[in-house]
């Protein structure tokens, strides 16, 4: 198949797994997570990814939202429609520990190899029949234990809406338990809704309700994202909930509420409502039992908690107040005339400013007027509409509340009420009535001011959400909008509905009078309808803030309308964040200008460090090949330019100190300058400060993040470092800003820069200048160990070297120099550049450098300091690099003897179950499992390896195949098995704890210390039981991979195949996904169903 056709086919599969489309910046990450490769648009001849997508309209449909976000959708394809349904229903884009954040976001997570989810002691443990047979599918008891338990989903967050632990089995045997799991929409798989009937029947066979075995387990309440659905009638739902609570005056468990709601109204209660009760004090009182359970108790709202903002929309009628003397009406009392009747009803309702139940009207009427209430009056309430307002509850004509239409002056009402009721509680009630009356008067005077309860905006639960930066006045208050289905997409849907409502409803008219703080619907530019809040008012114009966009504007009153409550269920989308690391300079005009120019109007990945009212965040630009830390970029941009070192071409610099030499020949130098002198003085002051001050908790780094600048004590003095990678809560990578050295340290070894020195320290730019030796080929990769060692021995930490600059490459940030030691300056023929080419360090490739020297052309005195290099220089150098390295390896015999291997990892016996994690899945015939109970030990070992090898001296050892070593793979050290030595200086290794095959440079392989040989190797090769297929297509493998990879599961062991080598052990298992609240998904059944569907298509 041609590459273009294959890319189109895989692209269609990726897009079909996202019903709501994929944002353009996320598409590459989603494609790679499924296929392992990037979309090859450049190889196909397109300059950008968007250009390629627009060239395949039969595969991709591109839409641009009002916020400027480009979203890609799959075009319909009849051939793969049925496959797409299966892929879509199992798609999971929420990576738990992958190297990518938010699929496309390559942000360094705080704990990248720490697993999220918690199956240990919480997964449903299966019971087994004693007659287990290896040859057939086991006859299992229900996988979910019966009894009291609070299940923690291993792949999701759990809501606090669980049954209280004091409830026994009998208490909820007949009542369905409602649980709400908050995850991204495309991350959930509901078999009831998406699977075909045969599979639904199978998956529901173990749907026994249960609670957790571990009653004492603490479950953290998550931040729950408000639902995107906001079209339900909030008023009606709130009134129904009040009715339920009024029937249960002694309280009701929140977990039982959905059941009673459905039983009474024949509708399902929107699960997002359960998270908003704490914000509805006018509807209910929420109480958490002191017994420590996760369930909450709901009570009817307390009258004293009624707020003015809620009395408008939630008109709860007070009970009719009895008169001072109650006399039953006489049987022979006269009947009131029709004209007088309406007038008397209007006068009566004034007494009940919070409303009167229609059913209570006859009794109150007869008690007050001593006349008989007309029998047919209640059957025709509409006839009273000209003297009172009628509010029908739940659409039931038998349940209505009557309100006075023309209230009397407020002072008279208050006076009468105080005379009739003297006790304190009644006075409090009258105060509430007075507030209600004020609003009624304001409404009748056309000066209505609306106070509407809007749910607060919840911070997304995903690791690295996308945000659109709107504007900022300082870096502590950056206005942003979250981009995603429950945020920007939900907002656009709401605005479309607002446009339809206000454009086609002739009854809505512009507001006549507004008040500061009032919420409105504003007809903005391009006929868009937006939610807004009044900031100030003028004669014909009002200044409003668009609460979903974060900016303000003056609009005409004729464009402002009363906001309908049904558009208030979605949180205000504009919110604020604080940029981490920039707090001390938050108001600096130069910094604000830089941040504004780099961020406003653009979409970024955001790493949320602290989920406070104003979250502390780091922004990342992920639009290029590398992620750019915006916070760090802005900080570097405002450094004091006068303290920078500006190297001039052909200039000579003396007293230069070489501070670091990398394995590719790159070196870092310090050149004497004003900035270096100021840095030295400042570090001395800090040394004195720490010497005189007792170390407190404020001095330690409590919240490490990438780009943060802090201090590290090294060789008796404090030095500036920048955090470059956070491995875990204990270990991280740092780069010394003023020497270029990179190492791993413990978080506890770092210190905060004292506040009094912080601003000065930030202003000083990094003093390490990146250089390379002129006239040496730059594309040869790693130097030979002997060449690097010779260079280090010659100049490293020598403080009186000299350099001559031949070229400054601004784009790469590197200077090409000639380097001299003190005794050889300024003889050009004795420079380090010439010595390293003449030294016996490249004996296997002398032609690389010796044949490259041209008389005169390479002289430091020449204006053109670049040598002419033969065309095959780099090729020959790379070709012979392996031979040089091998010889070097053999010259340094290893001081490590072959150590004993750790014992094999413990596996359950056939017929038993175990909790596992799947780090790698190729297809059902080959995947890797890790015992969940041991993972925390592996995390500790990984941390210790990072710290140990970051400070250990690099050893040159003779490597052998099929031996165990430590290898550095993507900034982490792993225990590996060497599988082979390639001809390009790389070696193939197998990660013994994670089951991955990697290629690493041979220089990154080190002896495995004895202290890291105790823990058994954690990766165990596995095969899925219960499936007959032996050959798996790429599509089937992709489906399986997305179902199990990076997930905690329950494994039922069928067979264990032992081997002398622990990495050759194999296990055949059934896998069960228990992340759904009431259904266990057997992976082999799911794959069998997929194969059946695939065969129908083919």
Swiss-Prot record:
Keywords for the protein's UniProt record, in alphabetical order: Cytoplasm, Differentiation, Phosphoprotein, Repeat, RNA-binding, Spermatogenesis
Entries under InterPro entries matching the protein: LOTUS-like, OST-HTH/LOTUS_dom, SNase_OB-fold_sf, TDRD7_LOTUS_3, Tudor, Tudor_domain_containing, Tudor_TDRD7_rpt2, Tudor_TDRD7_rpt3
Region listing for Interaction with CABLES1, in residue ranges: 893-1098
Any one annotated GO CC term: P granule
GO molecular function: mRNA binding
SMART domains reported for this sequence: TUDOR
Region annotation Interaction with CDK17: where it falls in the sequence: 861-1098
Domain HTH OST-type: 3-76, 233-302, 337-406
Positions bearing Phosphoserine: 319, 859
Gene Ontology biological process terms in this record: lens fiber cell differentiation; lens morphogenesis in camera-type eye; P granule organization; piRNA processing; post-transcriptional regulation of gene expression; spermatogenesis
Subcellular location: Cytoplasm
Domain (Tudor) ranges: 513-570, 703-760
Role, per record: Component of specific cytoplasmic RNA granules involved in post-transcriptional regulation of specific genes: probably acts by binding to specific mRNAs and regulating their translation. Required for lens transparency during lens development, by regulating translation of genes such as CRYBB3 and HSPB1 in the developing lens. Also required during spermatogenesis.
Family membership: Belongs to the TDRD7 family.
Name the UniProt record assigns to this protein: Tudor domain-containing protein 7
Gene name of the record: TDRD7
């Amino acid at each position: 198949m041609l590459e273009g056709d294959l890319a189109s086919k895989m692209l269609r599969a990726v897009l079909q797994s996202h019903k709501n489309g994929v944002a353009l910046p996320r598409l590459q990450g989603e494609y790679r997570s499924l296929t392992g490769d990037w979309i090859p648009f450049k190889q196909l001849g397109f300059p950008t990814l968007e250009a390629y997508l627009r060239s395949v309209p039969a595969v991709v449909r591109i839409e641009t939202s009002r916020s400027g976000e480009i979203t890609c959708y799959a075009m319909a394809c009849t051939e793969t429609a049925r496959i797409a349904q299966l892929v879509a229903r199992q798609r999971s884009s929420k990576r738990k520990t992958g190297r990518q954040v938010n699929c496309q976001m390559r942000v360094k997570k705080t704990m990248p190899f720490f697993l999220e989810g918690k199956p240990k002691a919480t997964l449903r443990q299966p019971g087994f029949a004693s007659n287990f047979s290896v040859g057939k599918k086991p006859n299992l008891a229900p996988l979910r234990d019966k009894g009291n338990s609070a299940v923690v989903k291993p792949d999701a967050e759990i809501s606090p809406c669980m049954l209280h632990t004091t409830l026994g089995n009998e208490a909820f045997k007949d009542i369905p338990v409602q649980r709400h799991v908050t995850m991204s929409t495309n991350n959930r798989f509901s078999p009831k809704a998406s699977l075909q009937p045969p599979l639904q029947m199978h998956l529901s066979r173990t749907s026994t309700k249960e609670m957790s075995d571990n009653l004492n387990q603490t479950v953290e309440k998550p931040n729950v994202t408000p639902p995107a659905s906001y079209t339900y009638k909030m008023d009606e739902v709130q009134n129904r909930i009040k009715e339920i609570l009024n029937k249960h005056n002694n309280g009701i468990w929140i977990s039982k509420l959905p059941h009673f709601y459905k039983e009474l109204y024949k509708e399902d209660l929107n699960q997002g409502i359960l998270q908003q009760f704490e914000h509805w004090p006018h509807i209910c009182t929420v109480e958490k039992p002191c017994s420590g359970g996760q369930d909450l108790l709901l009570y009817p709202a307390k009258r004293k908690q009624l707020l003015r903002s809620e009395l408008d929309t939630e008109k709860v009628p007070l009970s009719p107040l009895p008169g001072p003397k109650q006399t039953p009406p006489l049987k022979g009392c006269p009947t009131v005339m029709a004209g007088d009747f309406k007038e008397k009803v209007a006068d009566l309702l004034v007494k009940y400013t919070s409303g009167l139940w229609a059913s209570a009207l006859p009794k109150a009427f007869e008690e007050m007027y001593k006349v008989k209430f007309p029998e047919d009056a209640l059957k025709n309430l509409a006839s009273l509409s000209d003297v009172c307002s009628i509010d029908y509850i739940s659409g039931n004509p038998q349940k209505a509340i009557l309100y006075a239409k023309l209230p009397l002056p407020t002072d008279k009402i208050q006076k009468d009420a105080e005379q009739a009721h003297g006790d304190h509680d009644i006075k409090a009630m009258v105060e509430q009535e007075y507030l209600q009356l004020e609003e009624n008067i304001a409404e009748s005077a056309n000066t209505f001011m609306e106070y509407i309860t809007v749910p607060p905006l919840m911070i997304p639960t995903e690791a690295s959400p996308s945000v659109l930066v709107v504007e900022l006045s300082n870096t502590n208050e950056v206005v942003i909008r979250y981009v995603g289905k429950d945020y920007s997409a939900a907002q656009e849907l709401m605005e479309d509905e607002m446009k339809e409502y206000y454009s086609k409803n002739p009854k809505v008219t512009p507001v006549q009078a507004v008040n500061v703080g009032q919420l409105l619907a504003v007809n903005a530019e391009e006929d868009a309808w937006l939610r807004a809040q009044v900031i100030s008012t003028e004669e014909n114009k009002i200044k409003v803030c668009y609460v979903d966009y974060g900016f303000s504007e003056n609009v005409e009153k004729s464009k402002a309308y009363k906001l309908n409550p049904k558009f208030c269920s979605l949180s205000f989308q504009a919110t604020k964040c604080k940029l981490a690391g920039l707090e001390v300079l938050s108001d600096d005009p130069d910094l604000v200008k830089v941040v504004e120019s780099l961020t406003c109007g653009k979409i970024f990945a955001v790493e949320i460090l602290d989920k406070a009212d104003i979250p502390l965040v780091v922004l990342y630009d992920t639009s290029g090949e590398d992620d750019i830390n915006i916070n760090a970029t802005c900080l570097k941009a405002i450094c004091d330019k006068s303290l920078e070192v500006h190297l001039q071409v052909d200039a000579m610099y003396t007293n230069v100190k070489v501070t670091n030499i990398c394995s590719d020949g790159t070196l870092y130098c310090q050149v004497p300058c004003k900035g270096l002198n100021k840095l030295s003085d400042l570090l001395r002051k800090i040394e004195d400060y720490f010497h005189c001050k007792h170390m407190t908790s404020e001095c330690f780094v409590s919240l490490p993040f990438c780009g943060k600048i802090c201090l590290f004590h090294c060789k008796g003095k404090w030095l500036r470092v920048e955090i470059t990678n956070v491995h875990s809560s204990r270990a991280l990578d740092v780069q010394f800003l003023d020497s270029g050295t990179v190492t791993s340290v413990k978080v506890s070894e770092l210190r905060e820069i004292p506040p009094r020195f912080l601003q000065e320290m930030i202003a000083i730019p990094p003093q390490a200048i990146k250089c390379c030796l002129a006239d040496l080929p730059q594309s040869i990769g790693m130097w030979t160990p002997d060449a690097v060692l010779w260079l280090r021995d010659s100049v490293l930490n020598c403080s009186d070297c000299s350099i001559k600059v031949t070229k400054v490459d601004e784009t790469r940030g590197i200077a090409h120099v000639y380097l001299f030691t003190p005794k050889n300056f300024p003889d050009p023929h004795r420079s380090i550049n010439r010595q390293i080419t003449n030294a016996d360090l490249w004996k296997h490739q002398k032609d690389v450098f010796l044949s490259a020297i041209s008389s005169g052309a390479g002289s430091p005195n020449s204006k053109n300091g670049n040598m002419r290099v033969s065309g095959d220089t780099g090729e020959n150098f790379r070709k012979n690099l392996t031979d040089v390295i091998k010889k070097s390896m053999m010259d340094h015999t290893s001081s490590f003897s072959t150590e004993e291997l750790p014992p094999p990892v413990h596996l359950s016996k056939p017929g038993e179950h175990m909790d596992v994690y799947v780090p790698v899945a190729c297809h059902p015939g080959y995947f890797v499992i890790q015992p969940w109970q041991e993972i925390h030990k592996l995390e500790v070992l990984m941390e210790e390896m990072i710290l140990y090898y970051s400070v250990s001296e690099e050893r040159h050892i003779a490597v052998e195949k099929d031996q165990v070593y430590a290898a550095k793979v993507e900034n982490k050290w792993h225990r590996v098995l060497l599988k082979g030595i390639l001809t390009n200086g790389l070696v193939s290794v197998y990660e013994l704890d994670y089951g991955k095959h990697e290629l690493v440079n041979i220089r990154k392989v080190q002896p495995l210390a004895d202290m890291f040989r105790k823990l058994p190797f954690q990766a165990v090769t596995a095969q899925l039981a219960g499936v007959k297929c032996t050959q798996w297509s790429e599509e089937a493998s992709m489906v399986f991979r997305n179902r199990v990879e990076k997930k905690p599961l329950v494994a039922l062991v069928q067979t264990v195949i032992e081997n002398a080598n622990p990495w050759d052990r194999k296990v055949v298992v059934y896998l069960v996904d228990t992340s759904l609240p009431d259904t266990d998904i057997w992976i082999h059944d799911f794959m069998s169903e997929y194969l059946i569907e695939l065969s129908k298509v083919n």
